[in-house]
């Protein structure tokens, strides 16, 4: 009876505001309810549909206490010029409140060109730091203890190379790979679709990515092996709905490729991360 009364009141309310609502049409290609009431959750199962914090279906967060228990990492996207200059910037950021690093690489590094290659002329060190060798990587993280900081590297086609360099630098510091924390973007499918810093065709690129999944699951277990990215897709002109759809489709493709390569989904899925624009 209470719901019948509520429905009658709701219908009366909506009839009175339809004219005003018509002046502001939705732009997200969706038709959400204009007002939500208990009528919308009839048959709602608390444990199945909402759940508890930190438990499936994760509608209330992936951790029981979320940022109240562990604050999110503060990292500023940075990298420019030479490894020496970027190292100074990283150490400055860590000394002034940063709790992690986010590495930007120049375009030649992103597409596998050495800084001395004629194709790299005019682009070296312009939108990120130039990394040509392990020596550059050692300079980039000089005086930074890699077991004390997590590092995000925005690198895709040559992600396996930069990750290997990072592990090698850590070993020279006396830090074992299983202590390293961080993320590589490693999302080549969105490069084909929206951004363009790819090197190899899709099939061998996917093999490199699944190889990274497998290697890290065994040797670098705290490392996020991919950041499946919708942000770039949205910036390239998609709607919010398209961004979600294409990014989830990319994620499914990565999971299917890894399973096809013989991996157990539980061995790698926990280290798949996402990077969205549509939440902003």
Cite the ranges covered by each PLM segment.
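Catalytic alpha/beta active-site cores
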Residues: 1-279
């Amino acid at each position: 009876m209470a719901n019948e009364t509520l429905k009658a009141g709701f219908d009366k309310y909506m009839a009175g505001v339809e004219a005003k609502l018509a002046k502001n049409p939705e732009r997200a290609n969706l038709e959400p309810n204009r007002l939500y009431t208990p009528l919308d959750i009839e048959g709602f199962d608390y444990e199945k549909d909402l759940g508890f914090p930190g438990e499936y279906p994760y509608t209330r967060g992936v951790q029981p206490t979320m940022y109240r228990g562990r604050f999110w990492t503060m990292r500023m996207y940075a990298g420019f010029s030479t490894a020496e200059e970027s190292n100074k910037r990283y150490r400055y950021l860590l000394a002034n409140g940063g709790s992690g690093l986010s590495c930007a690489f120049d375009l030649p590094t992103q597409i596998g060109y050495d800084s001395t290659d004629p194709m790299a002329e005019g682009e070296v060190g312009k939108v990120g730091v130039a990394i040509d060798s392990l020596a550059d990587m050692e300079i980039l993280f000089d005086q930074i203890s890699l077991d004390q900081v997590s590092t995000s590297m925005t690198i895709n086609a040559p992600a396996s190379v930069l990750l290997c360099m990072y592990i090698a630098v850590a070993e020279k510091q006396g830090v074992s790979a299983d202590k390293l924390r961080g993320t590589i973007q490693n999302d080549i499918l969105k490069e084909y679709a929206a951004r363009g810093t790819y090197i190899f065709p899709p099939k061998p690129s996917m093999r490199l990515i699944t190889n990274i999944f497998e290697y890290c699951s065994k040797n670098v277990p705290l490392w996020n092996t991919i950041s499946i990215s919708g942000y770039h897709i949205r910036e390239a002109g998609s709607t919010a709905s398209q961004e979600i759809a294409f990014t989830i489709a990319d994620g499914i493709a990565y999971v299917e490729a890894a399973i096809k390569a013989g991996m157990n989904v539980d061995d790698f899925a926990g280290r798949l991360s996402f990077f969205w624009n549509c939440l902003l």
